[in-house]
């Protein structure tokens, strides 16, 4: 193999290694989460919000881990409904929240519920 061919092969291998490394970095980033505590004032209106958030959540790779259900609050106080949404990483969680699509949906949520939303990084 000529020196030019060896150099080209080395460059291709380095590119491939960089590609693999970037991929590993993406998969090893800590997950991002939205934790929401919600009091729903109008369940039919809140359903409109739930439908409106489907697209932005999907776009940013989110999945529901907790979506309502029974809960027990042994200390302090909490709203009636707890929602936990997982994102691939903290950046995706923040970008989804800041997205035009979600902000539009949030105006719907604000009409039909009162919520505390926290964005956190998991480990």
What are these regions (language model features)?
Residues 7-8, 107:
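Hydrophobic transmembrane signal anchors and adjacent membrane-proximal interface regions, especially
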Residues 94-96, 102-118:
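C-terminal structural segments of small proteins and small subunits
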């Amino acid at each position: 193999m000529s020196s030019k061919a060896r150099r080209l092969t080395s460059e291709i291998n380095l590119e491939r290694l960089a590609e693999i490394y970037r991929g590993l970095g993406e998969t090893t980033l800590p997950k991002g989460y939205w934790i929401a505590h919600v009091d729903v004032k109008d369940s039919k209106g809140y359903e409109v919000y739930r439908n409106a958030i489907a697209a932005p959540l999907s776009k940013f790779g989110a999945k529901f881990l907790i979506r309502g259900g029974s809960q027990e609050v042994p200390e302090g106080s909490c709203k009636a409904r707890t929602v936990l949404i997982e994102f691939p990483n903290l950046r995706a969680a923040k970008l989804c929240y800041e997205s035009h699509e979600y902000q539009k949906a949030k105006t719907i949520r604000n009409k039909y519920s009162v919520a505390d939303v926290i964005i956190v990084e998991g480990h």
